[in-house]
Amino acid sequence: MNGDFQLKSKVYLTGAGPGDPGLITLKAIDCLKKARVVIYDRLVNPELLKYARPDAEILYAGKASKKHSLTQDKINRLIVKKAKEGKTVVRLKGGDPFLFGRGAEEALELAKNKIPFEVIPGISSALAVAAYAGIPL
């Protein structure tokens, strides 16, 4: 592996919003358009994957109760592996990556491996539901 992978790769821990494809942020769409790898969760609306580059590697890493496609540890290692290959990676998570999304664990793993990353916030369903219902928080 090339020791200067940090110069070529970056990971975007990206919130996909609460499910409505119209609620993803423009910055998240921009990240999807440039990523060579997209690792997405179960709660991500699959329609959002249309924003990925045609040649992007799309990997499912969904988890449901007692039914994981990958454990969190394996997801962390996968993100690190793809970044060390010199690829721009979007870790696409339902809602916001740091609100019930285990984004902090992934960020710690990236920091431990000295891999540059950026957090792209997403609209959480905890906020969106109240707004849709007209209930102020």
Language model: regions and residue ranges:
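Class I S-adenosyl-L-methionine
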Residues: M1-A16, L26-I123, A128
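Flexible active-site lid/hinge loop adjacent to a nucleotide/diphosphate
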Residues: G22
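Short, glycine-/small-residue-rich phosphate/pyrophosphate-handling segment
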Residues: G134-L137
